[in-house]
């Protein structure tokens, strides 16, 4: 016990006033709550309520020479502000006994002015896989330059999620699905990604962009000809409207959408086979050109001029198994696309007692891609969200300028990470 535990109330009040008046040095005196030094809960063993601290406060300046400890001010401020329930994470459960002691022994004197006594309740933290939620550890990522700031799209912060393209509705739906638990667990981030896919599938306009291009030349399409195609922003829902998409002899498609030879399960473009170009024509791959290293640099195709989508001809309704997105090379808009992956390669990077969580950083969590987009996206505004058809959902980043479009990849159309993990 403290040798001063039996000091009288009057003497304690006198010393406390001197603490307030700045008559003592820091550490010379403290005010403690007289509870129970034999309590099995260490927090109830006469905890400190106030200490002398000569620090300038950002609001009150140097008006105060004493400052309260957390456990005292926690319940005190809740009571003054008439907070009915103080919701805390599970590590604060031992603090509830002290919270209640202060309420029962001190707040009794203010019940007429403040009639509602507060209650502390605990629940488990929201822990997401492949990231960390500790503010202290997130700050280390910022200070060490691992991420660009608190709003880096890889950060599990509201500002980071917003910049990446997550909507309030998707986050709310995720939280409602997870619910409140008393048990510590790790929520698979794939659930959060499912929620944003679900939301953007209903709300995002569909457009076309090519991230990894290979050139296609339609050899029987006139060199001096250009067309403007009317393309719907959403083929499945009304009210989205449409935009003009230019079409010409030379196009870009994705490299992975072409194979010289492929099995029957490959429904994209291959030599001697047909595919439909979205909102345009059916084309057939006739030949391809390679560079000195054997990489395909150009695909020569022919098109069926009667197969134009929506033209009403018999050929336009002809069924082919594959449909590809594309952009006209002549009209394509260059853009920077930032593709994001998991920030960490370990499901629970801060759960290893013998290792620093920084050891599990994913070196490929950010890939910057020089992409080619359809020209309608030139008028896209910061924060606007789109589905790049067959690729995923993307949002216009605040780094966009009048000269350069910048998109952040919000999420792919499918959970490719889980599929990859299951194959290992």
Functional labels for PLM-detected ranges:
Residues 7-10, 147-148, 163-173, 178-424:
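Basic, alpha-helical terminal appendages of large translation-related enzymes
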Residues 155-161:
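Active-site-adjacent structural elements in folded domains
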Residues 11-15, 98, 137, 157, ...:
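Exposed alpha-helical structural elements
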Residues 103-106, 141-145, 161, 175:
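Hydrophobic alpha-helix position signal
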Residues 85, 89, 161, 182:
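Short, flexible active-site loop motifs that bind/organize anionic cofactors or intermediates
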Residues 74-83, 116-119, 137-141, 148-155, ...:
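Short acidic (Asp/Glu) and glycine-rich catalytic loops that position anionic groups and cofactors
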Residues 1-138, 196, 205, 210-214, ...:
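Active-site cores that bind ATP or allylic diphosphates and position pyrophosphate for catalysis
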